[in-house]
């Protein structure tokens, strides 16, 4: 009995191994990718041939075209010691000096023709101020000042500066009468004077001498 069971067990074990081996072969055949054996590289054959140029046809010889390079511009330099002096042509520049000199002379001529206002004499009375004109005419004379004094002084001298438009831009008393009311009143009167305009752009000076008549 023991011998029969041992043989049966041995057959069973062998059948199991055979089945496992068969299953493994089947698995490899069905599921694993087919791996092709490496192929041997075939040698490449290279053939070198010499290509000959076709023979040239007889004809006229072609001329070579040569491009001319731009000539370099020569710059003349000042001659140094020991060098041969070279004449340098300078361009004549148009000078504006003659025109400027002409304009300056014209302005100076106009200034000489237009004299300063110079000395002006004026006589002050109770009703009016009579002005004896100098070299420049008056176009406006304000009303005469009114003084509340018992006696008029001898004279008052006022220096004036007049612009080209004819307005008195500055006035100062150079000789006072001694009466403040008279001096200040004549100064205000003088600043309101207006002379004729001139074309020359300059300020003219003059002196007005006021005297009084009763």
From Swiss-Prot:
Record's compositionally biased regions (Basic residues): 54-67
Keyword Transmembrane belongs to the record: yes
Protein name: Uncharacterized protein aq_1982
Membrane-crossing residue ranges in chain numbering: 9-31
Membrane topology field: Single-pass membrane protein
Top-rank taxon, per record: Bacteria
Record keyword Membrane present: yes
Alphabetical list of InterPro entries matching this protein: TonB/TolA_C
Keywords: Membrane, Transmembrane, Transmembrane helix
Locations listed in the record: Membrane
GO cellular component annotations of the record: membrane
Annotated source species: Aquifex aeolicus (strain VF5)
Region (Disordered): 53-74
